[in-house]
Amino acid sequence: QFNHFDPSFLEETNDAAAQMSNAGVSMLDLRSNVGGYEEVAHQWINRYSHQRVFSTGVRYSVLPASLVASPSTSKTPRASNDNILILLSGKCSASCAEITLDLSYNLDNSLIIGENTNGSMISNSGHIELPNSKCSVDMTFSTVYLTPDGSDYFEELRGFFPDIWVPAKEAETLA
């Protein structure tokens, strides 16, 4: 079970990825992972797959307006992978855990089992109250996550769809 992408455990995280990459079938439990440091997620999947794995989406910085990662005009390349990687997802899988799932969409032989994720890819959000309506909203002070046109595999507040939807409590047993 991987609950947080914490940079202080980067070495242990990378060691676990290397160990899992040698197994024919591995399972990464992200059901209670609320996010963390994005670089840890990228390093984990790259270490697991022994290659660079690309995300389909792109992060766009709102202050100042600029792309954090350049959008590709061509199709995102798939990363080959001979082993099976099962990722467990749930409603608490958020932020950086969702980035890991996005990366896994481009990794051969990966399978996401569980529930839709949290749908919170906006980075560094803050709670504000609108002055006239007094409605409470969360807004990002950093970046938003954009998916390719026509793509419906992720949406803010709805999350990522798993490949196989099962109740999160049962995902590990049914995997």
Q: Predicted regions: what is each one?
A:
Residues 1, 19-36, 86-88:
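Short acidic catalytic loops
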Residues 21-26, 51-54, 80-85, 107-111:
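Loop/turn elements at helix/coil->beta-strand transitions in domains of secreted/extracellular proteins
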Residues 35-84, 122-134, 141-145, 156-157:
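Gly/Ser/Thr-rich loop/hinge elements
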